[in-house]
């Protein structure tokens, strides 16, 4: 009926974000923050993180070939080593790279497509989040679905995507899973990509501690498009779809395990991180092949301070 349809439109979706997963409470008034809700993220249906993040004031994520990008948060668009340490990318309040390690394209390792929320922090945050947050930070909150959803999409240039999510609750345990897989032939010659992201979540209570645990894995296999060169090349419509570097590629995977134990004013967040990438640097003389990887383990300990008088 019209009444029930109107009522459904006015239902406000509730998204629960714990204090431990969020960076807003930790940063306080040191900058300016914006939160993209799950509803906003779903409405955008972004095929690249830039399509959602560029809705945030003071943010510009410049899309490169495939899933590559360059980020600006109240700053210039920084490239190469100049972008290292400028922005911190986090999942559930935990940086996805150790301090001092950098990949300026890190957003493709975060499941922004199915996030419970995405927090964007504008302004210096290195004192709280570590040395990788000179200009700001982007934090993705992992969802724990309570219902099953299957979505299929198709688009131009051989684009296809499948999104799955589901959850189950048994006693004091709640389990959730999300998966998104996308393939594209690319707008230009030999510039397609295949990308998959999987998250598994578990919520429970242990001796008075509220426990949230997540396992996240990502995989990207990308054929990279090189720069089209030539005077006024932009005026030649035939050049727009060409790729002068069909040999260029970027293959990357990541695996993260993290947990959040909260009780009273205390929050403990142990984590394990592993990532590996190989990509042909077609933009440099000699086209060197870069291969990098990192493994790290740690724990963040937080204690809230009461301001009551």
What is each residue range found by the language model?
Residues 184-191, 195, 210-258, 275-293:
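Flexible loop and strand-edge segments within Gram-negative outer membrane beta-barrel domains
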Residues 6-42:
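Short, acidic, small-residue-rich periplasmic hinge/interaction motif at the N-terminus
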Residues 13, 69, 134-136, 150, ...:
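Hydrophobic, lipid-facing positions within transmembrane beta-strands of outer-membrane proteins
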Residues 41, 53, 118-119, 138:
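Non-catalytic regulatory/gating segments with a bias toward low-complexity or hydrophobic composition
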Residues 94-122, 140-141:
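Short acidic/polar hinge/loop motifs at secondary-structure boundaries
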């Amino acid at each position: 009926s019209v009444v029930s349809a109107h009522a459904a439109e006015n239902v406000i979706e509730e998204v629960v974000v714990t204090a431990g997963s969020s960076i807003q409470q930790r940063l306080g008034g040191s900058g300016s923050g914006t939160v993209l809700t799950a509803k906003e993220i779903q409405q955008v249906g972004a095929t690249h993180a830039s399509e959602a993040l560029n809705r945030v004031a003071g943010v510009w994520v410049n899309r490169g070939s495939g899933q590559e990008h360059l980020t600006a948060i109240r700053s210039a668009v920084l490239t190469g080593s100049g972008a290292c340490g400028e922005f911190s990318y986090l999942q559930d309040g935990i940086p996805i790279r150790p301090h001092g390690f950098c990949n300026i394209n890190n957003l493709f390792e975060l499941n922004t497509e199915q996030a419970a929320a995405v927090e964007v922090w504008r302004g210096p945050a290195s004192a709280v989040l570590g040395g990788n947050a000179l200009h700001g930070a982007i934090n993705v909150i992992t969802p724990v679905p309570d219902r099953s959803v299957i979505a299929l999409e198709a688009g131009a240039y051989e684009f296809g995507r499948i999104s799955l999510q589901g959850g189950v609750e048994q006693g004091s345990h709640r389990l959730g899973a999300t998966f998104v897989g996308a393939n594209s032939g690319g707008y230009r010659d030999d510039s397609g990509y295949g990308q998959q992201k999987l998250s598994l979540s578990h919520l429970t209570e242990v001796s008075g501690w509220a426990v949230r645990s997540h396992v996240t894995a990502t995989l990207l296999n990308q054929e990279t498009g090189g720069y089209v060169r030539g005077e006024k090349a932009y005026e030649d419509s035939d050049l727009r779809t060409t790729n002068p570097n069909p040999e260029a590629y970027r293959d990357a995977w990541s695996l993260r395990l993290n947990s959040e134990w909260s009780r009273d004013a205390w929050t403990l967040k142990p984590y394990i991180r592993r990532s590996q990438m190989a990509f042909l640097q077609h933009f440099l003389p000699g086209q060197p092949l870069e291969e990098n990887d990192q493994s790290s383990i740690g724990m963040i300990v937080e204690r809230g301070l009461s301001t009551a008088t």
